[in-house]
């Protein structure tokens, strides 16, 4: 007994023994134990489910009657003898018939049950039917199924004995407290039935009163939450419950107000960090009261924020699917207004809370709405995405947005609006790592390798070193500042996804409406493209130009993209893109002469990249040919485009001073100018003159006249023929924007017509002699004496 007990007795493991057991083994043991407990509980639930199913099947099953057995001749004779032995003289005919009917039905009672012979000689089915019927459980009075709570099992000699108890039922008072709104809604539904009919004025007053009460309630809840979010976090649920307003009079307005109020509340109370779920160890650990209160606040905030986003998403889905709810509080016509408010709230949360939880869910919800058929909804979503991409400094939100857009473009087979891809032009990507792959851009490890640890450290030191490295990693993750390496890595990955979108469209959807947006995007990010793709990309762009399937603007974008590629890293490549110069030279005359011409902006960008920035690769004949063609084009353009073209000509004459030969009036040269030739190198531009400047000198726009006079003098930078500072320091693009006629305005303003006032001549002093004029004025100012006349006296009186 002694040795056996010593063998069975487990020794307490030493500290060295515990060190040998790795954390991985301990975690595996814990997982196995939890798996066994879950499997045993799962088996119990499965058996209970089978039992409940069998009982429910029997309760719904109709019982089959017994088969009628054929009577043997002996039984028939006994029944006849029994009927004859009855005292029929003492019974009425009705009683006799009733007894005979009972006797016919009592064949089961009068049959000889001791006989083993089959009732039907040929059929053995009746035996099986009888056995199945007897085995079928009887219908019993069913009790309500009670939910069981599984407790810890008890261990016995035979094994584990599972324990369970019935879940206590909450009293009815608590249920009434949890759902007080339902009774209020029911009362409100019952009141209109008994209420008398109201006039339209009374209905309007009643609605205004209800709406004012709801507004005050929303304001009170919002103010309480903002005053102390940690204490009043439970009021978020009450405010969110008002999203389900059922009063048809004020339902739409109240829901809109609650949506906007919740959006503003969340923007104010959401912390500046992402809330992660607690682990099991953190939940089991004892913490301070303040920490516990903070955890409750964070859990409540995340849950209510999640429910709020789900409500917004469901509102938009109901509007898109035109789904009617059970409660007719909101009609289908009003769902559009509700959905627009919901989309606006989603857009605001996307821009205001890019760091908080469920931001990726908001992106997934919002990106399909960018391609919505409703113009207002699409514009709201696109503007929100542009704001997010412009203000994203790290690049994490931009990467998530670009990935979702890429998936949508591919899933919809490139049938989306161009405005969706135009949003990608707002990406803030200035620096990427083009030499290494995305995996190589990760920061180098600062920790010791396994071989170094094993060589230099003991086992205990390795344990301590491992714990120290783990702590350092956690501290690095907790830092708020983002490293430059991480930023470059995110930007590189984002740019890879963007180029993947562009190259897919160039390869598979060259006739799509997205081609213009793709070419514009390639022109912006061309300096970040890897050198390996340059030859293939230039070949694709030239094939697109020569195919004839592109519009004028798309062909200009192709030219601009190709020169952006060649002006960046393409400087190391010895390529002369003469075919692109020839195409632009040929298509310059197709610029639209009337209306707001937005193609002029792209033309000015092309001239800047092709002639100014590549001045060393451009020949003098090519520059002179473009100068002559641009002056010809300027004759039939609007003032804003004409000013931009003349500013580009000034830039050409200053970059290539020998172009002043076109200002000479010599009639002889080494050939004849061929304006109809499409190749600028061989059209003999040195044998012509810029006679268009004489016509532009008398243009109705004053700025055009200034530029024409300036160019006729050779575009000097100093002297009498130089331009003013306000014109000479601006680029052609800036001048085009400043003098734009897009808003139907004229810059400088047109002078008004001269005033046509009548000239009145005043009469001054007519006499030169001052004394004479004074006497005349004095005589005119004297009042004449009034004399009384007497007509009764004789008119004449004779003198003696």
Curated annotation (Swiss-Prot):
Major place of residence: nucleus
Biased composition (Polar residues): 789-800
Cell location: Nucleus, Nucleolus
Coiled coil ranges: 449-490
Annotated stretches, region: Disordered: 1-91, 167-197, 780-800
Gene3D superfamilies: Leucine-rich Repeat Variant (1.25.10.10)
GO molecular function: chromatin binding
Keywords carried by this UniProt record: Coiled coil, Nucleus
Keyword Coiled coil among UniProt keywords: yes
Biased composition (Basic residues): 1-19, 42-53
InterPro entries linked to this entry: ARM-like, ARM-type_fold, CCAAT-binding_factor, Noc3_N, Nucleolar_cplx-assoc_3
GO process annotations (BP): DNA replication initiation; muscle organ development; regulation of lipid metabolic process
Lineage top rank: taxon: Eukaryota
Biased composition (Basic and acidic residues): 65-74
GO cellular component: nucleolus; nucleus
Family membership: Belongs to the CBF/MAK21 family.
Protein name: Nucleolar complex protein 3 homolog
Record organism: Danio rerio
Gene label: noc3l
């Amino acid at each position: 007994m002694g040795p056996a007990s010593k063998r069975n007795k487990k020794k307490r493991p030493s500290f060295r023994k515990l060190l040998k057991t790795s954390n991985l083994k301990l975690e595996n043991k814990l997982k196995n134990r939890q798996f066994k407990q879950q499997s045993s509980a799962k088996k119990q639930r499965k058996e209970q489910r089978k039992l409940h199913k069998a009982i429910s099947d029997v309760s719904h099953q109709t019982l089959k009657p017994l088969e009628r057995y054929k009577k043997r001749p002996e039984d028939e004779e006994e029944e006849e003898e029994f009927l004859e032995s009855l005292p029929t003289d003492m019974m009425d005919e009705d009683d006799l018939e009733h007894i005979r009917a009972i006797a016919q039905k009592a064949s089961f009672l009068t049959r000889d049950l001791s006989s083993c012979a089959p009732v039907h000689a040929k059929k053995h089915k009746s035996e099986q039917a009888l056995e199945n019927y007897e085995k079928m459980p009887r219908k019993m009075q069913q009790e309500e199924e009670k939910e069981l709570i599984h407790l810890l099992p008890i261990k016995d000699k035979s094994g584990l004995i599972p324990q369970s108890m019935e879940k206590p039922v909450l009293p009815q008072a608590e249920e009434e407290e949890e759902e007080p709104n339902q009774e209020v809604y029911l009362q409100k539904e019952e009141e209109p039935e008994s209420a008398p009919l109201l006039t339209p004025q009374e209905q309007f007053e009643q609605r205004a009163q209800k709406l004012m009460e709801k507004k005050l309630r929303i304001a009170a809840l919002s103010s309480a939450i903002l005053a102390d979010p940690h204490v009043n976090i439970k009021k978020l649920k009450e405010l969110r419950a008002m999203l389900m307003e059922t009063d048809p009079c004020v339902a739409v307005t109240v829901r809109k107000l609650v949506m906007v109020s919740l959006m503003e509340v969340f923007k104010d109370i959401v912390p500046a960090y992402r809330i992660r779920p607690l682990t099991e160890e953190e939940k089991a650990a004892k913490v301070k009261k303040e920490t516990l209160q903070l955890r409750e606040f964070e859990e409540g905030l995340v849950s209510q924020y999640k429910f709020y986003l789900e409500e917004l998403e469901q509102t938009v889905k109901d509007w898109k699917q035109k789904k009617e709810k059970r409660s007719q509080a909101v009609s289908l016509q009003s769902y559009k207004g509700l959905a627009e408010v919901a989309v606006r709230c989603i857009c605001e949360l996307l821009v205001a809370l890019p760091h908080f939880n469920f931001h990726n869910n908001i992106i997934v919800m919002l990106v399909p709405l960018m391609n919505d058929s409703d113009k207002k909804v699409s514009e709201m979503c696109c503007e929100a995405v542009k704001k997010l991409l412009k203000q994203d400094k790290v690049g994490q939100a931009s990467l998530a947005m670009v990935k979702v857009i890429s998936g949508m473009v591919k899933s919809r087979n490139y049938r989306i609006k161009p405005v969706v891809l135009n949003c990608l032009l707002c990406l803030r990507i200035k620096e990427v790592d083009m030499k290494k792959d995305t995996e190589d851009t990760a920061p180098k490890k600062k920790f010791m390798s396994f071989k170094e640890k094993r060589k230099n450290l003991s086992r205990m030191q390795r344990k301590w070193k491992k714990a120290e490295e783990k702590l350092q990693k956690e501290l690095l993750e907790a830092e708020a500042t983002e490293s430059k390496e991480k930023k470059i890595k995110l930007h590189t990955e984002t740019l890879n996804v963007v180029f993947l979108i562009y190259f897919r469209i160039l390869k598979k959807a060259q006739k799509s409406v997205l081609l213009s947006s793709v070419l514009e995007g390639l022109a912006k990010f061309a300096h970040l493209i890897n050198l390996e793709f340059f030859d293939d990309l230039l070949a694709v762009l030239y094939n697109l130009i020569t195919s004839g399937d592109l519009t004028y603007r798309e062909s200009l974008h192709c030219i601009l993209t190709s020169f952006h590629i060649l002006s960046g890293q393409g400087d190391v490549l010895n390529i002369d893109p003469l075919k692109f110069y020839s195409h632009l030279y040929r298509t310059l005359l197709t610029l639209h002469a009337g209306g707001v011409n937005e193609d002029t902006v792209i033309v000015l960008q092309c001239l800047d990249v092709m002639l100014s920035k590549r001045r060393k690769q451009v020949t003098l004949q090519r520059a002179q040919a473009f100068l002559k063609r641009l002056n010809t084009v300027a004759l039939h353009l609007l003032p804003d485009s004409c000013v931009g073209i003349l500013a580009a000509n000034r830039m050409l004459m200053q970059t290539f001073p020998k172009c002043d030969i076109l200002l000479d009036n010599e009639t002889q040269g080494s050939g004849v100018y061929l304006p109809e030739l499409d190749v600028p190198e061989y059209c003999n531009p040195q044998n012509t003159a810029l006679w268009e400047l004489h016509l532009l000198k008398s243009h109705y726009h004053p700025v055009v006249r200034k530029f024409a006079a300036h160019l006729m003098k050779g575009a000097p930078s100093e002297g009498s023929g130089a331009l003013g500072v306000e014109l000479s320091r601006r680029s052609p693009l800036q001048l085009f924007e400043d003098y734009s006629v897009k808003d139907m305005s004229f810059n400088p303003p047109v002078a008004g017509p001269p005033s046509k006032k009548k000239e009145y001549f005043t009469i001054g002093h007519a006499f030169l002699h001052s004394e004479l004029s004074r006497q005349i004025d004095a005589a005119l100012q004297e009042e004449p004496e009034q004399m009384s006349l007497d007509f009764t006296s004789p008119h004449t009186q004779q003198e003696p």
